[in-house]
A protein has these predicted regions:
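Acidic-and-aromatic substrate-binding clefts and catalytic sites of carbohydrate-active enzymes
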Residues: 108-112, 223-225, 250-258
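Secreted/periplasmic serine-hydrolase-like ester/acetyl group-modifying domain
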Residues: 2, 135, 144-242
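Short extracytoplasmic/periplasmic juxtamembrane "stem" segments immediately C-terminal to an N-terminal membrane anchor
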Residues: 50-68
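C-terminal regions of proteins
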Residues: 260-309
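Membrane-embedded segments
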Residues: 70, 77, 81-165
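Hydrophobic membrane-insertion alpha-helices, especially the h-region
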Residues: 19-40
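Residue-level recognition of beta-strand->loop/alpha-helix junctions
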Residues: 105, 249, 275-277
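N-terminal Lys/Arg-rich, disordered targeting/topogenic segments
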Residues: 1-18
Length: 309
């Protein structure tokens, strides 16, 4: 009889333990769902930048080759140099008789991020008539990637290709794939930035200046070697989906930006490379921080870009 009572108590204790474990797991799952919900739906409402990127990305997923009225479409693709250097509403108005213009700007990106995002857009059905990639030479040949943030804008196939291409380690690879599938994981850094900006409102300007440093000087031969491979793969991608590729090189303060090297390569490869403003010819007063144009500089560059496109 005591043995039966003992077994009964043990069974009750085991049941209570199982229920406790289940409650903990349910709590963890609910917490995870709440965090995902915050990341997926709240961040783009809290952050003006996140909201803009989400809106532009969604709009870029469904670009037709032509509008219902037969007008060709164009997508401008780039980073903060494009964002601040081209007055988009004015540019769109200037181009309205020729193109229906879209834009996708993701700050702190360089060639690799934008190339794989473009691949994803094409694969998901976007068919712009013209693709205009606006990147400085240093960003065209640069190897920096934004990683976790941009992973959510790339297909898993493209992300795997990027991992192999850059020989990323196992930890980084795991983080990127978590970021691809998890809204919270992909935006956790941005959430921290947003919170920091709320506490220290002036930190945005400081981080822009500190985080946007000139790339190490490259020789003409290095620029040519790297640019040629990248221009070729861009052209192959755009040709596959029937889009015309244009590279736009934005203005710089330095006269030695090797823009003419890229332009010459474009002519050799049959790619339109535009330099609306020659390097080193815009006054320093038209730049906000030595890299990005201010509103006056953007007004000048926007008009020049529209005239050559």
């Amino acid at each position: 009889m005591p043995s039966s009572i003992s077994n009964s108590k043990a069974g009750l204790q085991a049941g209570a333990t199982t229920r406790s474990i289940c409650l903990v797991l349910i709590g963890v799952a609910l917490m995870g769902a709440m965090v995902e919900g915050l990341a997926r739906f709240a961040l783009d409402r809290m952050s003006r930048i996140e909201h803009r990127i989400e809106q532009e990305y969604r709009g870029s997923l469904t670009i037709p080759a032509k509008t219902t009225s037969g007008q060709p479409t164009m997508v401008l693709l780039g980073n903060s140099i494009l964002l601040e250097g081209v007055d988009f509403p004015s540019f769109r108005s200037m181009m309205s008789s020729k193109y229906d213009v879209y834009r996708l700007v993701i700050e702190q990106t360089e060639y690799l991020d934008l190339y794989y995002i473009l691949r994803t857009l094409f694969r998901r059905g976007s068919r712009p008539h013209d693709v205009v990639l606006c990147l400085g030479v240093d960003h065209l040949v640069g190897d920096n990637i934004r990683g976790e943030f941009t992973a959510r804008y790339q297909d898993a196939t493209d992300l795997a290709d990027l991992v192999r291409r850059e020989h990323l380690d196992a930890t980084t690879t795991t983080n990127y794939f978590f970021a691809h599938w998890s809204g919270w994981f992909g935006t956790r850094t941005e959430i921290r930035k947003w919170l920091l900006a709320r506490v220290m409102p002036d930190v945005g300007g400081l981080t822009t200046v500190l985080g946007f440093r000139p790339a190490p000087a490259l020789s003409e031969s290095e620029v040519r070697l790297k640019s040629e491979a990248r221009l070729r793969e861009l052209k192959t991608l755009c040709d596959e989906y029937g889009a015309r590729l244009t590279i736009v090189i934005p203005p710089t303060l330095s006269k030695e930006d090797h823009a003419e090297v890229v332009s010459a390569l474009g002519r050799e490869l049959g790619i339109r490379v535009l330099i609306p403003v020659k390097a080193g010819t815009m006054e320093e007063s038209l730049f906000r921080d030595g890299f990005h144009l201010n509103s006056s500089g953007a007004e000048v560059f926007t008009a020049k870009l529209a005239s050559v496109l």
